């Protein structure tokens, strides 16, 4: 494999036995693709905004005289870019302008004659835009719209599994779910009658729906039943025989024909009997009269002479009926064929309980159910029923719904529309009856073929359509009012409802979430999250076990591991690594096609619906060099996801990769295959909580997924085009683009500005650090600068720490950890947290608040860190209570007593009419001010500090643009110089001229002269473009800010807090092995090995066996080997051994094992080998892919190569006594994370503070400055000790005895330390509550 310049800096050795067939796809596709479909920059096809507009327009007035037509739409450019929107606290959005056409028809002339057309662009609000990283900036904060997993539209057949009725009878039901519109349910009741419900309302007999569709009783029976025919001949009753129908019944009489008895009375009719009847071609048999009694007629029988109905359809036949039929001249009677086995009489029974008799009565019944209390009219009843299922405005199955519907009812694809037809409804009822009759299966609702993904674009489109429908109502009313002379489309449209709907969705929908920005992984997983909650989804309380469970169809689509613990378990899932959604919104996963036992390179994506029909082999099946299966029988997933053994020629597909089944976070856990699933779940979830450390450190033991995640997360800076590094410093990188990647006429320069020390949503620090040097070549898509938690373009969430598994004086009891002081000294887990504090100056009734350094009654020392505008300096170190922004608020005039007036008159005006309302640092916080931003309302004069900030921003912007111009000019003048030299101008002449003068030279060659003139024009263009860009920047910087009503000024102060690791902080490995630091131990007391190297963290070995996460042990061993090889390389470099030896050793390390990866160092130059070796000194980075990782033999081989014992255990000595520990101890390197659960954020103390209103007990929680709850069990503990007075104090004066605590306070002030407990307030509350129950309670004096 060929490596690029930057890849050669550090190569991760992979243990993967199988070569990668398919690269990891771009991880944010689900978000970006969905939103692109929504806004379609070049609308084609009916989706997104285009579909929404087309579904609502044209809007026609009620009289048809005018209509408002939609022509096209365009999205403008956003005013501010993403970064500016975040700073200003605005939404990153683009204006939507729609071209509408108002057409007026001439009423007098022929139909369709146009009288007037007005076309106009109408503003329809702002549409939030997605950033390149799949997020939205709403009011300055980054948000993510999580995709939703909801039940697909279509028809579903289900049963209650015998839970509804006491008898345990299974009741079947069918439900037609449209994308939008009314739900239609059919269900059996315990008596086997079929009922229908519309929108889950009161149930009606299902035949009412059929009658409302216009069917008569006879037609209904005809559709659902086969008939049996009886003939009356010479007083004999003959039945037309269909032998197959008799199977399984017991003969009630002798079945005979032509004198031969085929079945004796009382015998069960079997297939043998039927064959005999068919062989002899028996078509009729004689039956006793009783056999027809109780049967049901299939049609109306009318007395032809009188026109009177002798026997209506669906009536039971009795002896009288037979006589009446014979009298009316009928000798052939058709009855319904039913039996108790597999042809139930359900529809016939339902018709008997149906109170309606024709279409109108059925429509009225439906109207009464839907609109109780309203008087039904024929028109209203018809309109209601039609609008419910047969109107495209109110009902839409959608393409997905129609596809699922047709699949379920075996209708050919492409048949049918978005609304229901009569055949659709009848088809559903027929299939439901078939299932009740024992033919056919119910659907599995949790199958991923029945649940689909709704992503951002689709949800935004639905919200937009809701807004449009509101507008449509208003427009239609306005059009119907008439008098449209001089009215333009702009006058008709009010964009507020649209803006409101869109704003509500992006701002406060349950699926629009504050982005989890702890680290790059948490960003990526948040964008790939799939939630079953949200509008139109499930609710936590109602979701049962089945919905939450892992389903066979999750394989390769949703991760079976990564899901939250707690009430949302199983409802919130994560997309698997290779999963994607298809056009219908169903999840697909890729497979390699297998033809005749030969695995091909062809890759096909299958959805859960399609996958069920195939036999699929696992990714780790053994193949030979020709990609044929080597085993006689291969373990595969067969039909319905069941596992089994199959021969190679029976296999259709093979998995693409071993990590196909898990999500991105789970794919980061090395040796995942050796961890218990519950712990792996914790490991995957805790990686998302890791705080970026000061210096990122790549994991020695990784899985190979680190690079794709870091690149796709968008936190690092990636080269858009290849080139060489022309300039690099901490805040910007300039790349000179390769000639072949530039566009003609451009200078070929890319400038990347880096993000420095900004705050993330979780208050962690976002900072980018260049990882390239001047003059280095870079390729397109390669890393230029590392972001938070990335190291040379690889995800680095924690630190490689030397750990030992052993008890140490009880300091690692119950998952605690003992940490060496060295870890603190080296700042291994030091993190920076940035807090934003803001001060708002408002316009109050009594006058404007003012930001100033002149604050009443505050000493000089308190103002020492403020400038003349009253705002803190950048770089000031502040602690709790310090003033950051001085602010005074006017207070109401107070009446002064004469003495005060006199003092005022003598000593001058003391600022009495204002009170201090400055912004102070919250208690318990200290840090350094790293940035201040001042926002001033338009029309309010800016203070000096605001002007200074503006100056700096202008200078920065100008510097950026000037630099860009200089680089562009340099490129241009190089071409001019070459042209002039070719044209015969002497080198010396050029050296003596200023560069601008070169363009004024004249050349003899006309073609060259033309080229020179073109270059001169280009130079002029560059200058103009520079001026234009500078002007735009300048206007943006100096314009006033759009602040909330009544706000004059906002000052935001950013504090950076440096947090070292300390006891009480939570740490974890990647295998769910979490714990809290119990003690920071001096280095000299830590256990050390024979070389005197102390361990850094001591972990408890008892945390491993019961938790069954053995992966951490294997990681520790492999980490030790990786570090051992690094140490050997380090030794060789220090001894300055020749490069050949170094190259040989490193090659040996890369060649070890049976991995598919091959690294050939012979293609590397000496300089490249040296650079690689320098980067490997801290350890050889290894990748052990999920389910395809390193074997025990490979780990031992690496340990040997590193000169370490193959057991992975070494002798340790006690740091305090120097004595040897009696057993060997497992020591190695584990990748540890510091989680965002820091003791600083949790620790809190209170002496006195606020109390709850009713109970008068102290509030709870740090945010409320609450107290510690002394609960039931703590009371028992004090009771057990017999500590009566302590208990009394706890329950009275320290809690809710109001008088007692005020007295106590007074006593302490007076210096007399005794308490007088009284009655606790909560006792009074319970007394009042008992009195509220009308029980009087009086207190006696004790």
From Swiss-Prot:
The RNAP catalytic core consists of 2 alpha, 1 beta, 1 beta' and 1 omega subunit. When a sigma factor is associated with the core the holoenzyme is formed, which can initiate transcription. CDD domains: RNA_pol_B_RPB2. It catalyses: RNA(n) + a ribonucleoside 5'-triphosphate = RNA(n+1) + diphosphate. Its EC number is 2.7.7.6. It comes from Glaesserella parasuis serovar 5 (strain SH0165). GO terms for biological process: DNA-templated transcription. Keywords: DNA-directed RNA polymerase, Nucleotidyltransferase, Transcription, Transferase. This is DNA-directed RNA polymerase subunit beta.
């Amino acid at each position: 494999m060929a490596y690029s310049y930057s890849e050669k800096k550090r190569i991760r050795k992979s243990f993967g036995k199988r070569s990668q067939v398919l690269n990891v796809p771009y991880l944010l596709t689900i978000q970006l693709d969905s939103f692109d479909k929504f806004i379609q920059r070049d609308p084609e096809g009916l989706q997104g905004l285009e579909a929404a507009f087309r579904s609502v327009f044209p809007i026609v007035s009620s009289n048809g005289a005018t209509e408002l037509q939609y022509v096209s739409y365009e999205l403008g450019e956003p005013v501010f870019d993403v970064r500016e929107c975040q700073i200003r606290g605005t939404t990153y959005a683009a204006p939507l302008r729609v071209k509408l056409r108002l057409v007026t028809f001439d009423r007098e002339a022929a139909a369709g004659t146009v009288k007037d057309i007005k076309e106009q662009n109408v503003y329809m609000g702002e549409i939030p835009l997605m950033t390149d990283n799949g997020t939205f900036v709403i009011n300055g904060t980054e948000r993510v719209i999580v995709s939703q997993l909801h039940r697909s539209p279509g028809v579903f057949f289900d049963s209650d599994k015998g839970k509804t009725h006491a008898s345990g009878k299974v009741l079947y039901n069918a439900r037609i779910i449209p994308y939008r519109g009314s739900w239609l349910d059919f269900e059996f009741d315990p008596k086997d009658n079929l009922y229908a419900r519309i929108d889950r309302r009161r149930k009606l007999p299902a035949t009412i729906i059929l009658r409302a569709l216009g069917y008569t009783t006879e037609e209904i029976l005809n559709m659902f039943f086969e008939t049996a025919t009886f003939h009356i001949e010479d007083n004999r009753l003959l039945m037309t025989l269909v032998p197959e129908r008799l199977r399984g019944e017991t003969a009630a009489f002798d079945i005979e024909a032509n004198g031969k008895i085929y079945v004796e009375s009382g015998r069960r009719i079997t297939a043998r009997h039927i064959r005999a009847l068919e062989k002899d071609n028996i078509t009729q048999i004689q039956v006793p009269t009783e056999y027809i009694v109780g049967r049901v007629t299939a049609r109306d029988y009318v007395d032809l002479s009188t026109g009177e109905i002798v026997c209506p359809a669906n009536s039971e036949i009795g002896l009288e009926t037979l006589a009446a039929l014979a009298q009316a001249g009928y000798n052939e009677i058709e009855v319904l064929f039913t039996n108790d086995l597999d042809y139930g009489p359900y529809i016939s029974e339902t018709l008997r309980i149906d109170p309606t008799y024709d279409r109108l009565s059925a429509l009225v019944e439906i109207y009464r159910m839907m609109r109780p209390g309203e008087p039904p009219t024929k028109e209203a009843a018809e309109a209601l029923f039609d609008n419910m299922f047969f109107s495209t405005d109110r009902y839409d199955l959608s393409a997905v719904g129609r596809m699922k519907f047709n699949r379920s009812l075996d209708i050919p694809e492409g048949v049918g529309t978005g609304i229901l037809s009569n055949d659709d409804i009848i088809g559903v009822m027929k299939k439901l009856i078939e299932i009740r009759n024992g033919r056919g299966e119910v659907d599995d609702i949790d199958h991923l073929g029945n649940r689909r993904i709704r992503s951002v674009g689709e949800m935004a489109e639905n919200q937009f359509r809701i807004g449009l429908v509101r507008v449509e109502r208003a427009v239609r009313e306005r059009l119907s009012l008439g008098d449209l002379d001089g009215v333009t489309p702009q006058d008709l449209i009010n964009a507020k409802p649209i803006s409101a709907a869109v704003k509500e969705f992006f701002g406060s929908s349950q699926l629009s979430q504050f982005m989890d920005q702890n680290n790059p992984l948490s960003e990526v997983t948040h964008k790939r999250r799939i939630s079953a909650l949200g509008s139109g989804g499930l609710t936590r309380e109602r979701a049962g076990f089945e919905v939450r469970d892992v389903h066979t169809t999750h394989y390769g689509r949703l991760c079976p591991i990564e899901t939250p613990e707690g009430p949302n378990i199983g409802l919130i899932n994560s997309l698997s690594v290779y999963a994607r959604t298809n056009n219908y919104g169903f999840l697909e996963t890729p497979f390699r096609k297998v033809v005749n036992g030969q695995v091909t390179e062809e890759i096909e994506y299958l959805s859960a619906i399609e996958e069920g029909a195939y036999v699929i082999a696992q990714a780790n099946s053994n193949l030979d060099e020709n990609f044929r299966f080597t085993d006689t029988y291969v373990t595969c997933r067969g039909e319905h996801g069941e596992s089994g053994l199959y021969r190679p020629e029976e296999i259709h597909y093979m998995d693409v990769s071993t990590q196909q089944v898990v999500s991105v976070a789970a794919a980061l856990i090395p040796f995942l295959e050796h961890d218990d699933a519950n712990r792996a779940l914790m490991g995957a979830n805790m990686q998302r909580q890791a705080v970026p450390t000061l210096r990122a450190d790549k994991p020695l033991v990784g899985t190979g997924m680190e690079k794709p995640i870091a690149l796709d997360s968008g936190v690092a800076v990636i080269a858009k085009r290849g080139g060489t590094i022309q300039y690099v410093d901490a805040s910007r990188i300039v790349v000179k683009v390769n000639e072949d990647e530039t566009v003609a006429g451009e200078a070929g320069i890319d400038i990347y500005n880096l993000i420095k020390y900004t705050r993330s949503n979780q208050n962690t620090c976002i900072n980018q650090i260049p990882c390239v040097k001047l003059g280095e070549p870079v390729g397109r898509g390669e890393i230029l600068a590392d972001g938070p938690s990335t190291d040379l373009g690889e995800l680095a969430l924690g630190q490689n720490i030397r750990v030992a598994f052993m008890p140490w004086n009880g300091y690692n009891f119950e998952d605690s950890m003992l940490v060496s002081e060295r870890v603190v000294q080296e700042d291994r887990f030091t993190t920076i947290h940035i807090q934003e504090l803001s001060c708002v100056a408002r316009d109050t009734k009594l006058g404007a608040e003012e930001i100033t350094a002149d604050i009443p009654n505050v000493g000089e020392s308190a103002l020492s860190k403020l400038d003349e505008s009253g705002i803190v300096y950048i770089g000031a170190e502040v602690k709790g209570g310090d003033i950051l922004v001085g602010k005074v608020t006017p207070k109401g005039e107070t009446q002064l007593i004469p003495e005060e007036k006199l003092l005022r008159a003598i000593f001058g005006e003391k600022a009495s009419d204002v009170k201090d309302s400055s912004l102070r640092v919250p208690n318990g916080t200290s840090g350094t001010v790293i940035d201040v931003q001042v926002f001033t309302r338009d029309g309010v004069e800016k203070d000096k500090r605001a002007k200074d900030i503006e100056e700096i921003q202008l200078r920065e912007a100008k510097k950026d643009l000037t630099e860009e111009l200089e680089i562009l000019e340099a490129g241009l003048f190089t071409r001019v110089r070459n042209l002039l030299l070719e044209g015969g101008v002497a080198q010396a002449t050029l050296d003596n001229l200023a560069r601008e003068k070169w363009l004024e030279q004249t050349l003899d060659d006309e073609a060259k002269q033309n080229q020179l003139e073109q270059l001169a024009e280009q130079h002029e263009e560059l200058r103009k473009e520079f001026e234009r860009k500078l002007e735009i920047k300048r206007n943006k910087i100096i314009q006033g800010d759009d602040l909330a009503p009544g706000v004059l000024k906002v000052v935001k102060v950013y504090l950076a807090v440096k947090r070292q690791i300390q006891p009480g902080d939570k740490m974890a490995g990647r295998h769910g092995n979490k714990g809290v630091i119990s003690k920071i131990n001096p280095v000299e007391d830590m256990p050390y090995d024979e070389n005197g190297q102390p361990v850094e963290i001591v972990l408890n070995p008892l945390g491993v066996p019961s938790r069954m996460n053995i992966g951490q042990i294997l990681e520790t061993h492999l980490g030790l080997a990786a570090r051992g090889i690094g140490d050997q390389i380090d030794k060789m470099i220090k001894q300055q051994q020749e490069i050949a030896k170094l190259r040989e050793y490193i090659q040996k390390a890369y060649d070890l094992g049976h991995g598919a990866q091959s690294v050939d160092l012979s293609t590397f130059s000496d300089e490249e080998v040296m650079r690689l070796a320098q980067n490997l000194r801290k350890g050889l980075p290894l990748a052990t892919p999920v389910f395809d990782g390193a074997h025990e033999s490979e780990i031992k081989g690496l340990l040997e190569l590193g000169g370490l014992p193959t057991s992975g255990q070494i002798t340790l000595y006690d740091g305090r006594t120097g004595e040897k520990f009696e057993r060997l101890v497992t020591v190695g390197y584990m990748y540890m994370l510091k989680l965002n659960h820091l003791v600083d954020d949790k620790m809190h103390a209170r002496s006195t503070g606020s109390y709850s209103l009713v109970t008068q007990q102290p509030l709870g929680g740090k945010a409320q400055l609450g107290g510690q709850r002394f609960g039931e069990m703590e009371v028992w503990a004090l009771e057990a000790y017999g500590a009566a007075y302590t208990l009394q104090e706890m329950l009275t004066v320290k809690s809710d005895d109001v008088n007692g605590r005020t007295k106590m306070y007074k006593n302490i002030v007076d210096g007399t330390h005794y308490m007088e407990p009284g009655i606790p307030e909560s006792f009074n509350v319970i007394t009042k509550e008992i009195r509220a129950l009308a029980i009087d309670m009086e207190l006696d004096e004790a």
